[in-house]
């Protein structure tokens, strides 16, 4: 990797020219195809040229149309990674060869020149001018020297920064080639660099680099050398002016899902504004990516936290890959701000963010747009468009997708760059220019403002929807609102005026002017408008003729109008009479016998106005016409006036208020009309005074029969004569004789017997008035009362009850009556209801209920009620079936009566209707479809079976108001919780122009409104329709091969099972769906020539049809290739057959030879299998014998167990508090004045100060668990001086901790993880309090320990791994058949020949094990800590023939350098030691030879470790009993099938049972003692502890079960488990790996006894739980009983508690080390002083006690000056 930073000699401005729009809209996509793979591209600063670097070539394109400007070839060149840049110096026999040039760096220099660095010549660079002519060519290595290596670069402040990861070590350059190197623009000389160690170079892959504020950042992914470790994403940072990279720092970036799943693989990253946006995936091949947004402020703070953590002396620098991993120095008193550049670390605090959105695609690049949108390029030729959520600025939501490129460009979106209102997209073999937004598709301001595209805004000057960069004026946030029509909206011809538009939110003209256009813009005149705050005003043009046209308001640079209105130009001269002139809508005036828009002189104040006629005139009559008129006094009586009607003229006589015209013959033009109107003009000479309309009528057209004629108004003078109605009849109406009445028809024909039916009777001459027929109508003998009457031809009446059928009889007339009788009969019937379905429905109503009955179509009125509410009838299918829609119900489960009303009949259904719960929708899967719909989706919810049908649709908005934008798709209800639906089709009129939308879903389920709009909760993604390319001619296909179909958008919203492909009428089953490809497996033989329905088609070939959803696509005809081979291939086949025969003969010979070899190998394997069987049989027999004989310890061995002696209490406290630390000396104590310690100790007397220390540690997430444990030990050690005060502090802290845990809903985790300072303090305090009361339990534990030790030593123990034949831990079970025997040897201790010790050992024991046993046997009466270490003596074998032989683990003759690893440790059998041999102990003498023999070559002392029974031998270098390269399957991975293991590891599991049976009694005794089964009293502190937990559980409302978990965790998990796993705390015994394994099993068993959950045991359960499962089942109830006994025991009195605390105070007074602990605690407080001071100041109580000031006095005491804070950082010049 290489970081380069260099100052240019000639500083030039780096400001880019303002982006120019390359071309106007209208072109959706432009593509440049490259012959070679494109490495990178960049745009020139003037935005006119695009430079593209492909393999061996650089090309410049015109930005307007992507046409080629210039092109230059840069490769291939003669190069080799094993040669120098000039190729003159190569390593050994290497020579330069033809090598392709891959461009790694492509940058525009400040001078405008093009910088290109390739993968050849060690990554050197060249510069080109704008015409791609070579300017300079340097040899300095800059870029990565491999095509596959990563290189990122940027130019910042005239400096080039490069990060590169070379993959080839080249001797031709500096072997310490930095990963980053910045060159001067002229000579490319590097200035500063930081290096990666060679071991780490291949781990880093650089993704991008960017700058923010005064920092430079590089994003890299790190793949650990160990495959078990996860891939991480590192953010590297250093200051811009940091030439020595002192500020070089790293943090880890993590992106996690909602379930806290970590997505480790970074796929793309981009930085914009104050956000760092990155895309991650769960695996490199995952098709789902999660996008996380990191705040740059959080990035800065995370770097600062890590730097500050190192500043306080915590942890190390952790930059081992660049050679910086020293320990951090504590300099907390030195200030450090967030922008500091004086320290760099690779801290352990990572930056974690949760995923903001999941993208269902493999994201390969990201691009941010104006901090409004984010574009994600994918590997499948798509750009996913995302926008920031309006409610949450850190949340993203998808609003569209774009297909990019074509088949020739490749499918992966490598890089995206904004280019004006377009995107430049780099694909593997092409550059694509695509529109940035969809704004051009929105034509109105309102549509633009509500667009889902966040980049779209309304540009007022151009009146178009566009992006902000394309608008020359201000963007509109509020659309203009036009208030009414323009004023005026009409003008007179030949006049001009100012027209005003009342428009709100109209911005003032800036950079443009407003114009008014009269008529269409292409054929219109325009005038400049004047803008005011209230609107716009325009002067109008002169118009010469009346017309109506459109007036538009536009801007001078717009093509679209702001508003359009109809505008009228009128001409008053068109009105010929005074009255029409004065009454016109245009305000015309009558001036001097003509109409004008305005009068120069006084206009007429009144006009003659003829009033409409009140009485019409009969057509064909000749009579005078009298008309009323107004303002007749204005007429000149001397002038002759006359009337003119239909061309006939008659003189007119003018009265004061009327006009009488002479007789005129009035003839109608069309006598078929009953009424007509003709104009009548009053003339004065040739001048028309006024015009009135005269109404004419025709009697024959007004009445067709006698009764109607005689019923006409007497004023019409119509009479009946000559069988017609006429005004010429001279007979009176009284003497007229009419025809008899007649009934033509009636309806309905039947009705209920209860009556009430309204019958309408139609006929002729049914009376002249209602009185002629009132009370004279009978229907089948029942009276019928009139409800409606029309003269002569219609009577409506309501019939009374009836029981039979009969005609309708009507008597017409008063004096003399005529009777009319119908020919058809009316029937009285009985209406009945048999059943109804369904009889249940949702509470919201709308259920379509069908009623079945008889005579349901009878009667005139029918209605249905459900529960007393109307059930609107939908339709009546017949006399037996009707349907209605139920109303909403009042309550769920209520039964409602169903009643049918037919006129006066009322019928109730026997079964009631039941209202049930409304259906609800919970989820839909899948939530994606295409525009044509028809995809099957599953809908889950509840109460679906309460409705009979459901239909699915999409709506425009999740909130009202909204509209349905799709058709209604049917659903199939399967049960109450599941139904399947077809996705709906988007309506063509509503089809959005964007290719992708997310629309809310709604369902039509009766009248249930809750599912009509599911809102934002459930939205369906609508994608473009999948399309398939038709065949070009007939498609030829091999039947046995899969059929591959090409198309677009195939898998966006469809799965393989959504496609139905037919070849003819046979199915072709889909096996794979890609975005552009569909693969199916079809019939092997060619089907019949049909379509998918089996309909025959023309020709011999079947039709290929694809059905997906509602889409049906015919792709064309397909023809299967003929299976008969063509004749021209016969010779080829013959040759192939001959070649096959020869090949078979050769193969047979080879097979015969191989068969002989396999038989030999088989016999060998058979022999190995027999050996394996013998070994297994032998092991089983031995295991059976051990199980039957070794069930208890022998009496002899039992007698060897000595009485236990607990270590003294001070030593126990020291072991408990400082088991993992060494507090024997503290450098800080020597530097700390006693007065300072006294002042600090005084501070500890304030509870608030201690509580603040604990709070500071608990709230600091950077403090590790081990640091918290150390802090707890320091506090306990210091507080032990006053044990009562210590107890009070611990109890108060515990109470507060319990309350916080309950409040945080973590009550069940109390004492479980012990990651809290409070819990650690409490466990240590509890152990100290109970130590003196644990003598019975410790006795049982000691016997158990000795029993386990004896059982383990009975068999072989591996000195390297600690595996033992006899153990109760499966992990440390020796899975080998080790042949050994017991030897009795004699030991002469240290030249005491007269005293010998007898010892039993194993012949397989290593020498270090023998020494340990010798020391234990000789010094068995001496405590272990006082015995000599095995490094202090040697053993010599007394041999008369060979002399004394010194025993060592490794022979002095064979060293590590001479032996093949691993080396076997020597055993007693290797030295030939026999039974009865004598060994002598001698003092160890350290010489060079003995040092070498002691395995010092391994880098560490083996003997000191073995002295503690802790094998330190590396299993890769040494082995004892188990050789890693041979043996069982556990230790060896077979390299060939012929290798058979010597035995099966699982056979040895029976040894666990042997060991368990031996020590089972001791385990039970120990567990029973912990449970106090044999004791009636308990330690007072235990009762005190349990009572505290009971009280706090009651106060905080915690259940009894959780409280018991607290007790079990505190008593067993935190105290007893610590004792069991660490016997060195209480006994003076050695440490042993094999014993640790045994004790871990005992500890696990003890925890299981106190577990409250019943474990589920099986074959896969851990052996530690299976071994003692029965014991655990017996003892678990006793643990609950223990808690009950303690709880029910008498409460602990204050006096008893005080006595106990006094005794404890006396015990702890003998403990030492509190001064050292006080000094270390002061050092910790000093390192966290700022945080503690802030907490003290924020607390009112501690502030009143002046604790912040007191602490400040202590912290400001001067200490000796340490080294410089950055002394651990190595600078690289």
Curated annotation (Swiss-Prot):
Coiled-coil positions: 1150-1188
Pfam families: Plexin_cytopl, Plexin_RBD, PSI, TIG
Transmembrane segments: 1131-1151
GO molecular function: semaphorin receptor activity
Signal peptide residue numbers: 1-19
Cellular localisation: Cell membrane
Swiss-Prot/TrEMBL keywords: Cell membrane, Coiled coil, Developmental protein, Differentiation, Disulfide bond, Glycoprotein, Membrane, Neurogenesis, Receptor, Repeat, Signal, Transmembrane, Transmembrane helix
All copies of domain IPT/TIG, residue ranges: 741-829, 831-916, 919-1006
Positions glycosylated per UniProt: 65, 241, 494, 566, 670, 693, 855, 877, 975, 1007
Annotated PSI domain residues: 438-480, 571-608, 698-739
Residues on Extracellular side: 20-1130
Sequence ranges on the Cytoplasmic membrane side: 1152-1764
The Sema domain, residue ranges: 20-436
Disulphide bridges, residue numbers: 83-90, 117-125, 239-341, 255-292, 310-328, 439-456, 445-479, 448-465, 459-471, 516-538
Topology with respect to the bilayer: Single-pass type I membrane protein
SUPFAM superfamilies reported in the protein's UniProt record: E set domains, GTPase activation domain, GAP, Plexin repeat, Sema domain
One GO term describing the cellular component: plasma membrane
UniProt keyword Cytoplasm present: no
Annotated GO biological process: motor neuron axon guidance; negative regulation of cell adhesion; positive regulation of axonogenesis; regulation of cell migration; regulation of cell shape; semaphorin-plexin signaling pathway; sensory neuron axon guidance; synapse assembly
Primary localization: membrane
PANTHER family: PLEXIN, PLEXIN-B
Protein role: Involved as a receptor for mab-20/sema-2a in the formation or stabilization of cell-cell contacts at several stages of epithelial morphogenesis. In early embryonic development, required for proper ventral closure of the epidermis. During male tail morphogenesis, involved in precursor cell sorting and in the formation of distinct sensory rays. Involved in axon guidance of SDQL neurons during neurogenesis.
Assembly: Interacts with mab-20.
Full protein name: Plexin-2
Gene, per the UniProt record: plx-2
């Amino acid at each position: 990797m290489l970081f380069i930073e260099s100052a240019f000699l000639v500083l030039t401005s780096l400001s880019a020219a303002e982006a120019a729009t390359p071309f106007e809209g209208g072109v959706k996509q432009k593509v440049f195809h490259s012959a070679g793979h494109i490495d990178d591209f960049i745009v020139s600063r003037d935005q006119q040229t695009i430079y593209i670097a492909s393999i061996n070539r650089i090309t410049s394109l015109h930005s307007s149309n992507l046409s080629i400007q210039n092109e230059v070839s840069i490769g291939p060149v003669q190069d080799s990674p094993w040669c120098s840049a000039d190729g003159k110096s190569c390593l050994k026999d290497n020579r330069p060869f033809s090598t392709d040039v891959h461009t790694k760096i492509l940058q525009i220099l400040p001078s405008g020149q093009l910088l290109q660095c390739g993968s050849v010549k060690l990554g050197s660079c060249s510069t080109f001018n704008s015409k791609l002519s070579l300017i300079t060519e340097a040899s300095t290595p800059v870029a990565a020297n491999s095509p596959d290596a990563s290189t990122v670069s940027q130019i910042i402040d005239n400096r080039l920064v490069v990060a590169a990861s070379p993959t080839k070590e080249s001797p031709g350059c500096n072997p310490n080639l930095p990963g980053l190197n910045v060159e001067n623009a002229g000579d490319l000389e590097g200035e500063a660099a930081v290096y990666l160690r060679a071991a780490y170079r291949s781990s880093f892959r650089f993704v991008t680099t960017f700058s923010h504020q005064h920092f430079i950042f590089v994003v890299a992914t790190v793949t650990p050398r160990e495959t078990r470790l996860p891939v991480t994403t590192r953010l590297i940072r250093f200051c811009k002016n940091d030439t020595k990279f002192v500020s070089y720092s790293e943090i880890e970036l993590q992106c996690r899902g909602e379930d806290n799943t970590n997505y480790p693989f970074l796929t793309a990253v981009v930085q914009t504004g104050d956000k760092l946006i990155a895309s991650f995936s769960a695996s490199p091949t995952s098709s789902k990516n999660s996008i996380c947004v990191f705040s740059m402020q959080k990035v800065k703070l995370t770097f600062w936290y890590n730097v500050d953590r190192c500043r306080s002396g915590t942890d190390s620098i952790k930059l081992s890959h660049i050679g910086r991993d020293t320990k951090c120095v504590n300099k907390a008193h030195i200030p450090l701000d967030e922008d500091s550049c004086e320290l760099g670390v690779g801290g352990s605090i990572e930056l974690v963010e949760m995923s903001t959105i999941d993208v269902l695609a493999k994201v390969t690049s990201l691009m941010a747009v104006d901090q409004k949108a984010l574009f994600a390029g994918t590997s499948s030729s798509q750009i996913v468009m995302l926008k920031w959520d309006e409610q949450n600025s850190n949340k993203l939501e998808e609003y569209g997708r774009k297909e990019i490129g074509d088949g020739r460009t490749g499918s992966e979106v490598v890089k995206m760059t904004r280019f004006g209102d377009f995107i430049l997209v780099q694909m593997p073999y092409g550059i694509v220019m695509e529109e940035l937004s969809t704004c051009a598709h929105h034509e109105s301001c309102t549509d633009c403002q509500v667009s889902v595209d966040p980049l779209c805004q309304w540009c007022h000057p151009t009146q178009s929807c566009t992006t902000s960069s394309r608008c020359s004026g201000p963007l509109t946030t509020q659309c203009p609102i036009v208030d009414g029509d323009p004023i005026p909206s009409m003008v007179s011809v030949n006049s001009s005026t100012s027209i005003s538009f009342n428009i709100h939110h109209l911005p003032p003209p800036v950079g443009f002017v407003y114009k008014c256009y009269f008529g269409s813009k292409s054929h219109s005149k325009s005038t400049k408008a004047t803008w005011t705050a209230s609107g716009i005003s325009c002067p109008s043009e002169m118009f010469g003729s009346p017309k109506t046209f459109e007036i538009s308001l536009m801007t001078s640079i717009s093509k679209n109008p702001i508003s359009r209105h109809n505008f009228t130009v009128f001409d008053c001269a068109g009105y010929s009479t005074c009255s029409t002139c004065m009454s016109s809508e245009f305000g015309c005036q009558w001036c001097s016998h003509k109409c004008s828009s305005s009068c120069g002189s006084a206009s007429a104040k009144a006009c003659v106005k003829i009033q409409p006629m009140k009485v019409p005139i009969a057509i064909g009559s000749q009579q005078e016409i009298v008309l009323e008129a107004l303002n007749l006094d204005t007429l000149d009586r001397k002038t002759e006036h006359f009337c003119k009607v239909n061309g006939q003229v008659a003189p007119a006589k003018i009265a004061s208020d009327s006009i009488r015209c002479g007789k005129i013959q009035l003839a109608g033009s069309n006598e078929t009309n009953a009424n007509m109107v003709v104009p009548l003009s009053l003339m004065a000479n040739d001048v028309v005074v006024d015009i009135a309309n005269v109404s004419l009528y025709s009697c024959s057209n007004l009445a067709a029969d006698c009764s109607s004629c005689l019923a006409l108004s007497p004023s019409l003078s119509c009479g009946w004569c000559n069988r017609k109605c006429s005004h010429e009849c001279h007979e009176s109406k009284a003497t007229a004789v009419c025809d008899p009445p007649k009934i033509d028809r009636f309806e309905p024909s039947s009705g209920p017997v209860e009556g009430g039916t309204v019958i309408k009777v139609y006929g002729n001459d049914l009376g002249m008035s209602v009185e002629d027929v009132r009370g004279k109508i009978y229907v089948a003998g029942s009276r019928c009362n009139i409800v409606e009457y029309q003269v002569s031809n219609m009577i409506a009446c309501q019939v009374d009850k009836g029981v039979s059928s009969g005609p309708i009889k009507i008597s017409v007339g008063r004096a003399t009556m005529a009777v009319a009788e119908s020919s058809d009969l009316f029937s009285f019937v009985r209406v009945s209801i048999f059943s109804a379905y369904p009889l249940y429905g949702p509470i919201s109503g709308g259920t379509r209920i069908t009623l079945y009955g008889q005579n349901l179509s009878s009667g005139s009125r029918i209605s249905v009620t459900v529960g007393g509410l109307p059930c609107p009838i939908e339709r009546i299918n017949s006399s037996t079936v009707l349907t209605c829609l139920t109303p909403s119900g009042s309550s769920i489960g209520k039964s409602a009566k169903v009643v049918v009303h037919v006129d006066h009949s009322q019928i109730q259904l026997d079964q009631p209707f039941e209202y049930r719960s409304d259906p609800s929708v919970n989820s839909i899967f899948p939530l994606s479809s295409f525009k044509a719909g028809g995809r099957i989706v599953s809908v889950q919810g509840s109460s679906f079976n309460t409705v009979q049908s459901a239909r699915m649709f999409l709506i425009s908005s999740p909130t009202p108001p909204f509209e349905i934008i799709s058709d209604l798709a049917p659903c199939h209800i399967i049960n109450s919780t599941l139904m399947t639906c077809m996705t709906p089709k988007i309506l063509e009129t509503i089809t959005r122009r964007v290719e992708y939308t997310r629309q809310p879903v709604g369902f039509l389920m009766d009248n249930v409104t809750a599912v009509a709009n599911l809102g934002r909760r459930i939205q369906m993604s609508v994608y473009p329709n999948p399309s398939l390319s038709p065949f070009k001619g007939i498609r030829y296909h091999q039947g046995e091969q899969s059929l591959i179909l090409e198309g677009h958008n195939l898998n966006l919203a469809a799965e393989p099972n959504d496609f139905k492909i037919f070849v003819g009428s046979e199915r072709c089953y889909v096996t794979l769906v890609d975005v552009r490809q569909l693969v199916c497996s079809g019939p092997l033989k060619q089907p019949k020539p049909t379509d998918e329905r089996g309909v025959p088609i023309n020709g011999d070939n079947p039709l290929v049809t694809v059905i997906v959803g509602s889409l049906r696509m015919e792709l064309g005809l397909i023809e299967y290739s003929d299976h008969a081979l063509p004749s021209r291939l016969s010779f080829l086949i013959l040759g192939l057959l001959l070649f096959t025969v020869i090949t078979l003969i050769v193969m047979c010979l080879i097979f015969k030879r191989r068969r002989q070899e396999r038989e030999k190998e088989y016999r060998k394997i058979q022999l190995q299998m027999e050996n394996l069987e013998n070994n297994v049989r032998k092991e089983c027999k031995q295991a059976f014998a051990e199980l039957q004989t070794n069930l208890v310890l022998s009496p002899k061995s039992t007698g060897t167990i000595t009485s236990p002696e607990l270590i003294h209490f001070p030593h126990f406290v020291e072991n408990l508090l400082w088991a993992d630390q060494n507090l024997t000396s503290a450098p800080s104590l020597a530097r700390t004045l006693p007065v300072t310690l006294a002042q600090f100790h005084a501070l500890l007397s304030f509870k608030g100060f201690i509580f603040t220390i604990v709070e500071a540690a608990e709230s600091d997430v950077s403090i590790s668990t081990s640091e918290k444990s150390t802090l707890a030990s320091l506090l306990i050690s210091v507080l032990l001086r006053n044990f009562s005060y210590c107890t009070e502090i611990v109890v108060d802290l515990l109470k507060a901790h319990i309350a916080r845990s309950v409040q945080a809903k973590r009550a069940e985790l109390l004492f479980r993880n012990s990651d809290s300072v409070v819990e650690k303090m409490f466990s240590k305090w509890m152990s100290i309090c109970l130590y003196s009361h644990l003598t019975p339990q410790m006795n049982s534990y000691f016997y158990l320990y000795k029993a386990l030790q004896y059982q383990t030593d009975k068999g072989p123990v591996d000195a390297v791994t600690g595996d033992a034949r006899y153990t109760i831990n499966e992990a440390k079970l020796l899975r080998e058949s080790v042949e050994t025997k017991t030897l009795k040897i004699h030991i002469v201790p240290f030249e005491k020949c007269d005293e010998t010790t007898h010892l039993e050992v194993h012949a397989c024991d290593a020498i270090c094990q023998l020494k340990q046993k010798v020391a234990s046997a000789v010094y068995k009466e001496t405590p272990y800590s006082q015995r000599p270490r095995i490094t202090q003596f040697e053993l010599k074998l007394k041999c008369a023939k060979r002399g004394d032989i010194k025993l060592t683990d490794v022979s002095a003759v064979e060293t590590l350098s001479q032996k093949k690893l691993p080396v076997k440790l020597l055993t007693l059998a290797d030295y030939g030691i026999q039974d009865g041999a004598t060994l002598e102990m001698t003092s160890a003498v350290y010489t060079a030879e003995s040092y070498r023999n002691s395995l010092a070559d391994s880098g560490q002392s083996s003997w000191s470790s073995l002295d503690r029974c802790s094998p330190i031998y590396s299993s890769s270098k040494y082995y004892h009993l188990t050789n890693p390269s041979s043996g069982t399957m556990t230790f060896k991975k077979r390299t060939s099938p012929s290798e058979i293991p010597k035995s099966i590891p699982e056979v040895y599991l029976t040894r666990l049972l042997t060991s368990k049976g031996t020590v089972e009694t001791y385990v039970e005794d120990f567990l029973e003692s912990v449970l106090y089964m044999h004791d009636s009293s308990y330690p007072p502190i235990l009762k005190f502890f349990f009572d505290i937990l009971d009280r706090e559980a009651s106060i905080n409302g915690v259940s009894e079960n959780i409280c018991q978990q607290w007790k079990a965790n505190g008593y067993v998990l935190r105290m007893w488990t610590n004792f069991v796993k660490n016997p060195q705390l209480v006994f003076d015994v050695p440490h042993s790996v094999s014993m640790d394994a045994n004790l871990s099993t005992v500890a696990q068993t003890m925890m299981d006894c106190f577990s409250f959950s019943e474990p589920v045991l099986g074959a896969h359960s851990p052996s530690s739980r299976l071994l003692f499962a029965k014991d655990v089942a017996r003892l678990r109830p006793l643990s609950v009983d223990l808690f009950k006994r303690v709880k029910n025991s008498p409460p602990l009195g204050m006096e008893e508690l005080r006595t106990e605390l006094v005794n404890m105070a006396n015990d702890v007074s003998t403990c030492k080390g509190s001064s050292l602990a006080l000094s270390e605690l002061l050092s910790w407080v000093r390192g966290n002083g700022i945080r503690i001071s802030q907490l003290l100041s924020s607390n009112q109580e501690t502030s009143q006690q002046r604790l912040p000031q007191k602490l400040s006095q202590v912290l400001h005491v001067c200490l000796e000056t340490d080294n410089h804070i950055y002394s651990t950082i190595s600078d690289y010049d």
